Structure formats: structure tokens, C-alpha cells
UniProtKB/Swiss-Prot annotation:
It comes from Xenopus tropicalis (Western clawed frog). One of its GO terms (cellular component) is cytoplasm. Zn(2+) 2 binds at residues 85, 88, 99, 102. This is Ubiquitin thioesterase zranb1. It catalyses: Thiol-dependent hydrolysis of ester, thioester, amide, peptide and isopeptide bonds formed by the C-terminal Gly of ubiquitin (a 76-residue protein attached to proteins as an intracellular targeting signal). It is an enzyme of class 3 (hydrolase). GO terms for molecular function: cysteine-type deubiquitinase activity; zinc ion binding. Its EC number is 3.4.19.12. One of its GO terms (biological process) is proteolysis. Disulfide bonds: none annotated. The RanBP2-type zinc fingers, also called NZFs, mediate the interaction with ubiquitin and determine linkage specificity. RanBP2-type zinc fingers 1 and 2 (also named NZF1 and NZF2) specifically recognize and bind 'Lys-29'- and 'Lys-33'-linked ubiquitin. RanBP2-type zinc finger 3 (also named NZF3) binds 'Lys-33'-linked ubiquitin and shows weak binding to 'Lys-6'-, 'Lys-48'- and 'Lys-63'-linked ubiquitin chains but it does not interact with 'Lys-29'-linked chains. The OTU domain mediates the deubiquitinating activity. Belongs to the peptidase C64 family. Gene3D superfamilies: 1.25.40.560, Zinc finger, RanBP2-type.
Amino acid sequence: MTEHGIKWACEYCTYENWPSAIKCTMCRAPRPSGAIITEEPFKNSTPDVGSMERESGSPLICPDSSARPRVKSSYSMETSTKWSCHMCTYLNWPRAIRCTQCLSQRRTRSPTESPQSSGSSLRAIPSPIDPCEEYNDRNKLNIKGQHWTCSACTYENCAKAKKCVVCDHPTPNNMDAIELANTDEASSIINEQDRARWRGGCSSSNSQRRSPPTSKRDSDMDFQRIELAGAVGSKEEFELDLKKLKQIKNRMRKTDWLFLNACVGVVEGDLSAVEAYKTSGGDIARQLSADEVRLLNRPSAFDVGYTLVHLSIRFQRQDMLAILLTEFSQHAAKCIPAMVCPELTEQIRREIAASVHQRKGDFACYFLTDLVTFTLPADIEDLPPTVQEKLFDEVLDRDVQKELEEESPIINWSLELGTRLDSRLYALWNRTAGDCLLDSVLQATWGIYDKDSVLRKALHDSLHDCSHWFYSRWKEWESWYSQSFGLHFSLREEQWQEDWAFILSLASQPGASLEQTHIFVLAHILRRPIIVYGVKYYKSFRGETLGYTRFQGVYLPLLWEQSFCWKSPIALGYTRGHFSALVAMENDGFDNRGAGANLNTDDDVTVTFLPLVDSERKLLHIHFLSAQELGNEDQQEKLLREWMDCCVTEGGVLVAMQKSSRRRNHPLVTQMVEKWLDGYRQIRPCTALSDGEEDEDDEDE
């Protein structure tokens, strides 16, 4: 016997192995233990039942690893009596009135089709497909399903491999889709074989072709099959999707990622993500594109064309919506002095940083060495009315001004102060983010933003180095304030410490919103009182009251000596989670504006009268008083007079005097304001004809 004759061929890969091998050397398939039947039974003769029983009882060797017996005769008899579904071609049992797979109604046989009898059907059956071939097809597909192809080098790896053996490329995430596609391919092959058997069992070869389904149920089944085929998807489509997403990500910039994070933040209620996007200068009116929606991959939440406002309304984020709506109204072009003169602004920031010092001693708080108060120049009144209107639109926050004046009388409610005493307050526009408090403080003093976080750093360092002093005041004030509203409770020291740690953390985070305690510390850094005029209640964008704001009142630098502080306060406005600087316009200075008060000022000094009572003539609260400093209204008024220059007007309004002088003001601030105002002086408005010109025209006529 030759060498070729003693080898045995593998039934899977046809590799010729040595006689001693019990498995195939190439594919590891087991060696068959006997002859494999390759002849097709029932080829030219009618099968005999007895012979079929004997044949079914004989041992048949199957190349399948599970060694399933190949029972052919009984299987052919059963399939010949089954009926095929006209929708999915599935072979159902004769007693079934509906298809087991797709539930389609069994169709009645047409007159041209003769009923299937056992004899005729068996005689009409052509050479049936050998079950060996069917099992081989199944095994080939199973082997294919047990491997995955590397997308980088196209090497076929085992299913258990976590990465490619050749190039170490990780396993793709679409293994389920690949297996599903393989299963669909296997079922299609088997259905083709079943369909061939069914066609062979038909009595007449010239039967008419069946008409396509026209009923509503048949149409629905077609749609279901189409949707199922689309859901399976292919590996190529999945790879194209991954490639498309990768291209989108490569095109994304930092601003784009901040915008997507803000959108997710609105859905999940994360306000910090929205503030981070706003602080970076992002456009609040930006809409989601198709690529961005595809990248977010949450169709239930995001849709093309949505903005942050749409998402806030959809998910009922009222706090975010209030801030975003304010941002929309401020979307108009703004032009403040700090924007016109960037070089001077940088010099002023360096001056501020150089003027920050730390006091030596037990109370080691930081403070500013210069007293500066920002006012709008009186030369604005010399501009034409149209230019004045343009200037105020670009430098003021009209929404804040309207809310503090019209919606609730908080500022400029006294005609005596606003008209006769020239003490009208104007709300300057600034950034609507967590830094608005620090911006408004620097705007009320130096006329610029806290862009370099110089004031925030001084705030954090003061809170950290003087934590014991401020903590005692804060704890005592919070306890008294709660009891004043009838809330009698006691907290453990650990809870107080946790709340205080949160206040400290806010001071160190750029863009984080600040609280009343931070205003109290800022009063010590400035070494001057801070008066906050604000709304009393938090309200939603629908106008619903949500709670008390607690910001309005007077903040005195009580931990300093009075001799170390200035008595000229600054004013801030608070509306809907936003602080604004309230400044006055320069005036000529009058000696008789305060009833019974002799100001002893020259014409260069501007005196602004800031009311210490609200529109109902109730004294403003003084924040963070100790138990010894608390008292009745007369005692609090006495305390205000000790820390500020106060007087009573002819109308009986208790006011504090804010004094400023252009001559004594910082030269850099004066130069910045003059350069900003020159831009409006050069604007030539479209004026109408004068009276003299009209008369000349009349004479010509």
C-alpha cells in the first residue's frame, strides 16, 4: 500500500493525516471511526418501509462532533407530509392551521394543485439532499461563528481571544452582531434546503406561481421581516459607524466638548457644566447639530436644533433656565470701559494685585491699600440723546435695572434721592457666571472685572488664614437667623464643620457661586461697608416664589478696628442669582443736599446718597452681628452711624454718603474712562434740520 493509501482524509479540511493521528493536524477535527455514507438513498426506487426501519437502525457515522445519528427515511416521510408557509417557507406539521414561526394563516390549496398523497409525493421526490451535507453546512457555519476577524490585519482569531494574536488589536464590541449575522446566514442556508425539499414534494411541476400577498396581515409581515433584516446589521456598517464617530470626535474642539457637557449637565441637573461653558465664552443660543446628537447617542433626550434653553424647559430645570434667559437678554453687543482699553485694564489689574497686603497679628486678613470708587462720567450728559441711549444700552444691564426699579421698588424708589440729590443708581453689565460677585465688587471700585482672580485668591486666603474668626461669626449668625424665623434646632459640631468646609471650597473654585459669608469677608478686604440691594425671594421663570434670598442688607467690616476702615460704602444689586455693580453718575456737589448735614466738600467731590432703608422705610438688616451687637432698631442705626457717614434727608430717609473725587481717583481709571468716552464723542447722530435752516427754506419758497 502506498503512502497515500494509508493516510486518512479529514472530512472538514480534506487534509491527509497519518494513520496514527486520532485528530486532524490542521483543524483538530476527530478522526471518523468508520465509513461515511456518501450515496444518496432513494435514488431511483420507491423506498420500502421495512428497509427504512432497518436503515434507520444501522449505525451511521456523522462527521459532526456531537455524533448525531442521521435518520433519513423517517425524516423524509415526515417532511413530505408537512406544508410550507407561503411567507417564511417554514415546514409546519399537517395539523397546524397557522405557521409556527410567523403565525401566517395556512392557505387553501388551489384547484391546479393536486392533493399530496403518500405514494405520489414519494414518487415525485427527486434526489433529496443528503443529511451529511446539511450537517456539514451547519458545522462550517458553527466554525465560522467561533472566530472573529481582526479589523486591523484581517486575521481570524478564536472567539475566546480578547485581542488579535498577530497585531494585539482589541476584540471589537460588535461580536453579538457578528454572531447574529452568522446565525441569519445559517438559517438562510437551511431554509433554502427546506424550500428545495418542499418544491420536490409538489405533485405538479407546472403549477402556477403564487401571487404575492395582498392582505394587510401579509403586508405587515413583510414590514416586520424588513425591520428584522435592518436590525441585524452587518459588520461593515458597524465599522463605518465607528469610523464616522471617530471622524466627528477628531473635529471636535474644546468649546464643542464644553457645549456637549453643558447639554448633558442640563439633562442630569449639573449646573457646574453649564457655568463652565458660559465662563469659556460659549454661545448660549447654539443649537445641537446632527453629528453632535449622534455623538451624544441619547435620542430620548437630545434632538437636532435643541439649545440649552430647550433642554432646560424639557427637563424642568428652572434654576438653569433663569440664568440662561438672563443670558439671552444680554446677548446684545456690550461695550464697557474695560473692553475698550485692554492695555490700561492690564495695568489696573497689576495695580490691584500690588495693593493687596496681609495684616500682621492674630487677625491676618488680606486688605486693599487704595480707596477707589467708580462713577460714570458727567460728560455723558453732554452727548446727544441718541448717543446717550446707545451708551447706556452698551454699558448697563437693562434687565437688572428694570427688575430692581419697576418689578419691585428696590433702588431709585425715592424721587428725592434720584432727582433732587442726583443719587440715581445704574446697574453695570458684567459676566453672568459664578464670578459675578467679584466682578461687581471690582466694577464698583476700579471699573474692571476680576479676570485674573486676584480678588478671589485674596478671598480664599483670608478665609483660610482667619478661619476661626469668620467661623465664629458665621455660626453665631446662622443660629440667630434660624431662630428669628421660628426654626429651633441644634446641629452637631461635625455638621457645622462640614458646612463651613463647603463655604471654604466655594472660595477656591473659579466660577463657583458665592454666599453671604463671602460678601462679609470682601467687606474686610475692601475695608469699607458693602450695601446689597436685592430681591427678597427666589422666583422661577414662571414667577413662582421658591424661597428667601437673604442677600439684601449691610455688610460691615466688624472684625477690623473702625480707624482702619473707610466710611464710604459701595452698592451692589442682586437679582435671580446674579450680582451687579450699582454706580452713580458724577455730579457737581452741593452743600445743602443733606438735611442738617454740612458736607464741607468742594465742587470736585461727588456725593451719592445710598438709602439704608427699603421702600417701606424699614431699616436694612446688618449681617453677621454678634450677640452683644444685636439690639433694637435704634441700636442698629447707631451702629450704622459709627461705621458710615450717615444723615437724614428732608424727606426723612436715612442715607449713607458715598464720596468720590475725580481728582483723587486713580489716574489709570480716569484715563480708561476718558478713552472709552471718546469713542462715543466721535459718533455723529442723524440730526434733524435746525429752526434756522427751516426758516431759510421757507424764504426760498
